[in-house]
Amino acid sequence: MHASVRVPRHVGIIMDGNGRWAKGRNRPHSFGHRAGVRAIKRVMYGCEDLGIEVLSVYAFSTENWTRPRTEVRALMRLFHETLEREFDEIHSRGIRIVVSGRRGELSPRMRERIDDAERKTAQNPNGTLNVCLNYGGRAELVDAVRSLIESGVSAAEIDEKALAARLYQPQLPDVDLIIRTAGESRMSNFMLWRATYAEIFITDTLWPDFDVPDLERAISDYQGRVRRFGGRPEPAEPLELSS
């Protein structure tokens, strides 16, 4: 990776492969999810060291409720335990915690823990961990539109800026780089608004095995791309040959 070249401000990760990782070791899915939490911690601190401002991790989607009830319960318990266990260290390193998603379907205990973590870390200056929990890109847009309607905004006043201001975490910048693990090549309803012009990096590495060197490879690939944002770079001026 070229340290002197730009790094993305906002990296989003679709963490895939926990179940396959556990199955390959003849262990239950919960074993893979716990290993996946350790990977989040490694990558979060790697982003901090590299100067990446925001890391968004796709922890639980609005569609994940259709998984077996025992797995959903185990995941929710793991989220709460992880926030309890890791909070002090994350806070001491100056990392801000925010959560994107529909909170109404989470337990009161979980909502209280999230609110507490967001409040206590709100002024932390060393980057942001955005946990996408009960999150869906379509749900985020639906909720943003509902918020606009409820606020009494007229149709003539609705534009991209107005809609963006109603997203779950409107202060966050657009996603520059999306990393998807386990070789899958779908967006899976992740960050549909913010990732409009994100670069995408796909790796066969299963999420529990993903580490800082994998992150650095993804960023190195990102650094080699030309980001056009729908436009086209100006052609180089023709050389004037002396007669």
Predicted feature descriptions by range:
Residues 1-243:
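Flexible, compositionally biased loop and terminal segments
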